[in-house]
């Protein structure tokens, strides 16, 4: 697997994703980049909408989280290298705290109907 730092702002579709918070307080996406067919780790997240599962990172990249949260071995490999390069010692998976519907394939914004077939009345917000 190749390892590289992206030099430009990208549009990233991330599958099998999670959100990690470092001991520095920064949050990063970890997962599988559908367009590049590679494991991917984001620079620190600057803005994030958990309802639409879209975000902007410090590099200017736009992320769209696709499907359910999960684990990707390529993403984990990149995370191990990136976290060492960035001096991250301790981290926590904060996915369930930031994305209440992380187990659902569709974000709340796209999920018009709940499992019972009635309109979904759920709403969410973050700080």
What are these regions (language model features)?
Residues 1-54, 61-127:
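Cysteine-centric segments in proteins
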């Amino acid at each position: 697997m190749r390892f590289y730092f992206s030099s430009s702002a990208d549009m990233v579709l991330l599958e099998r994703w999670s959100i990690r918070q470092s001991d520095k307080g920064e949050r990063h996406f970890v997962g599988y980049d559908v367009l590049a067919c590679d494991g991917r780790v984001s620079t620190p997240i600057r803005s994030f909408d958990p309802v639409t599962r879209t975000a902007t990172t410090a590099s200017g990249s736009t992320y769209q989280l696709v499907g359910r949260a999960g684990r990707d071995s390529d993403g984990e490999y990149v995370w191990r290298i990136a976290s060492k390069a960035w001096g991250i010692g301790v981290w926590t998976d904060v996915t369930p705290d930031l994305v209440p519907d992380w187990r659902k394939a569709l974000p709340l914004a796209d999920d018009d109907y709940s499992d019972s077939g009635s309109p979904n009345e759920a709403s969410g917000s973050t700080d």
